[in-house]
A protein has these predicted regions:
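Flexible, glycine/small-residue-enriched loop-and-beta-strand segment within the central core
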Residues: 16, 38-45, 49-120, 157
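Signature tryptophan residues that serve as conserved aromatic anchors
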Residues: 111, 171-172
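Beta-rich strand-turn-strand
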Residues: 104, 115-128, 134-138
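Gly/Pro- and small hydrophobic-enriched strand-loop and loop-to-helix capping segments
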Residues: 139-143
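ABC ATPase nucleotide-binding domains
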Residues: 179-190
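Extended, small-residue-rich solenoid/repeat segments and analogous flexible loops
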Residues: 1-38
Length: 190
């Protein structure tokens, strides 16, 4: 009986864990496409777009971000210092160790391309761009364009030159109409 109960419990966990859906806290005006998943430990700001089959765990995401399909943010990593990397042995360990701890922090107005992976304990600055297919293992400065495996800085966006003025407007704290008006009145948008 114990074996059947154990199997049923693990099946229920698999159903819950792998069921796609929006379980996170999120702000106004967000768009979540088919197959999107974000766990309860994720917090999402306003007016973000999330592409199909994107998976997010343990992340804090600002506002006005554009996240393409098939992006993975915050996947856990196995303990490489352990005798075995198998999670199947965790039930028998005296001191259970979870997959990598730490959250991902993504600023405002960040663009993340298709098939990007952002590992835990990484901070992505405002206005950054992560090129398609990149694996981001380290922090990304504001307005940097990064790409590759592992991701490296390619260059900075032209908005970087106006970063101080952009930050003063705090445009990402407003609804689209007010945000556009602020940017236009400060000469930051045509």
């Amino acid at each position: 009986m114990d074996s059947k109960l154990n199997k049923a419990f693990h099946r229920l966990i698999r159903i819950i864990m792998f069921k796609k859906g929006v379980y996170c806290k999120y702000g106004k005006g967000c768009v979540f496409k088919e197959g999107f998943f974000a766990d309860e430990e994720t917090v999402v700001g306003n007016y973000n777009f999330f592409g199909r089959f994107t998976t997010i765990t343990k992340a804090n995401i600002g506002s006005y971000c554009s996240i393409a399909p098939f992006v993975t943010i915050g996947p856990g990593e196995h303990d490489l210092g352990s005798v075995s990397t198998s999670e199947r042995l965790n039930a028998y360990k005296t001191h259970k160790q979870s997959l990598t701890d730490g959250d991902v922090f993504i600023g405002n107005d960040v663009w993340i391309g298709t098939n990007v992976v952002v590992l835990r304990n990484v901070r992505i600055g405002d206005g950054a761009v992560l090129a398609a297919g990149s694996i981001v293992t380290k922090d990304v400065p504001p307005y940097a364009i990064v790409g590759g495996v592992p991701a490296k800085i390619i260059r900075y966006r032209s908005a970087c030159e106006k970063e101080e003025l952009i930050r003063k407007t705090n445009w990402w704290n407003y609804a689209p109409e007010k945000a556009a008006s602020l940017l236009k009145s400060n000469g930051l948008m045509n």
